[in-house]
């Protein structure tokens, strides 16, 4: 569950500008502010089921955006490559060719 929440938070950060105001509000309250479906429903004067349906549709939309734009995947790969580069730089014997390959891989992501 925590893994899904973390993924949704990342996807929301990357793609929130593509959502409607209502979708942004529901997702923000549910994932960032940790409100329950009932609390959100009460705040917007709608049913709990309406909030649930909206959040599920929005989650599916965020996954579709990620499938097409792969911003999260590129971000995670960039983080992995930067961590590897830092590790290589901290080692006593630098492997120049390997560092060049890591830098080239980072450049290709952009």
Curated annotation (Swiss-Prot):
It holds the Pfam family UPF0122. InterPro entries: RNA_pol_sigma_r3/r4-like, UPF0122, UPF0122_fam_protein, WH-like_DNA-bd_sf. Might take part in the signal recognition particle (SRP) pathway. This is inferred from the conservation of its genetic proximity to ftsY/ffh. May be a regulatory protein. Belongs to the UPF0122 family. This is UPF0122 protein BcerKBAB4_3669.
């Amino acid at each position: 569950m925590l893994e899904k929440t973390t993924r949704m938070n990342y996807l929301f950060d990357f793609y929130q500008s593509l959502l409607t105001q209502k979708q942004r509000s529901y997702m923000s309250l549910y994932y960032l502010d940790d409100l329950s479906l009932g609390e959100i429903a009460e705040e917007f004067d709608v049913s709990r089921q309406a909030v649930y349906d909206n959040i599920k549709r929005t989650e599916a939309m965020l996954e579709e955006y990620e499938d097409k734009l792969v911003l999260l995947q590129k971000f995670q790969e960039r983080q992995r490559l930067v961590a590897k580069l830092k590790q290589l730089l901290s080692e006593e014997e630098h492997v120049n060719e390997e560092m060049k390959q890591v830098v080239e891989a980072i450049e290709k992501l952009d």
